[in-house]
């Protein structure tokens, strides 16, 4: 018997989903339906890994962002192949839950990071460490004012397990709501963690291979996790970056 199906397949890095938009859309939406049909046949639970990207660019009154926020997302941009296909995957999951009474849950991750990320990942933390190590430079895009909260995988995994096996609700944000930080300040933290004064921080324009219109802010409301599982993130950003530095120096 199969107790649980988790749909984790996808292309989450903006550089790569811009490069492969059709593959991205398929993985997040049509493959989701295939897995839902499989779960239905096997009578198993189903968990869809969605994304914080489904919220798009929330207005200030919706930050931190609750699961009930419906999103502000463009259907015709370089980011749409990812954002809208994740939304489609969520809709498929909702339909199977309601039409077929399938036991389903949706997880919306907010900027997980940690050991295992590749040097060519192109997302901000591995990218900043890679260029700091190889070029002694860190390049925040634009003015570097765009903010995120970063959740170390050590904090994320126990909550994923909790949601999969014990969660009472349908949709859960998983992330760290405590430390919203700009890309420029993140670069300064990484420079300090690296302990090398020779590392330069230089703002650059968005490269052509990077999707435009990225969200200006992203911060989750994790009240569902706090209420059900007494969730408190244990890894502060500085500590997490120190841990990632050891990994990056070894692997990058």
Give the location of each predicted region:
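Conserved active-site helix of classical SDR/Rossmann-fold NAD(P)-dependent CH-OH oxidoreductases
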Residues: 32-33, 87-94, 126-129, 158
């Amino acid at each position: 018997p199969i107790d649980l199906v988790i749909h984790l397949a996808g292309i989450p890095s903006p550089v790569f989903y811009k490069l492969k938009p059709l593959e991205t859309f398929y993985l997040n939406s049509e493959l989701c339906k295939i897995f839902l049909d499989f779960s239905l046949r096997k009578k198993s639970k189903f968990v869809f890994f969605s994304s914080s990207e489904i919220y798009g660019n929330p207005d200030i009154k919706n930050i931190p962002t609750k699961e009930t926020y419906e999103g502000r997302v463009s259907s015709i941009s370089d980011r749409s192949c990812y954002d809208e296909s994740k939304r489609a995957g969520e809709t498929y999951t909702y339909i199977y839950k309601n039409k077929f009474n399938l036991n389903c849950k949706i997880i919306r991750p907010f900027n997980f990071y940690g050991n295992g990320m590749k040097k060519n990942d192109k997302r901000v933390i591995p990218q900043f460490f890679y260029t700091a190590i190889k070029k002694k430079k860190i390049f925040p895009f634009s003015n570097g004012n765009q903010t995120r909260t970063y959740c170390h995988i050590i904090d994320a995994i126990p909550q994923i397990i909790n949601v999969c096996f014990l969660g009472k609700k349908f949709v859960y944000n998983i992330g760290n709501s405590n430390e919203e930080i700009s890309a420029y300040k993140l670069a300064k933290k990484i420079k300090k963690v690296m302990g090398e004064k020779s590392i330069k921080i230089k703002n650059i324009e968005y490269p052509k291979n990077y999707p435009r219109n990225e969200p200006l802010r992203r911060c989750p409301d994790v009240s569902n996790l706090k209420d059900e599982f007494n969730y408190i993130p244990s890894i502060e950003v500085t500590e997490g970056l120190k841990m990632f530095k050891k990994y990056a120096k070894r692997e990058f």
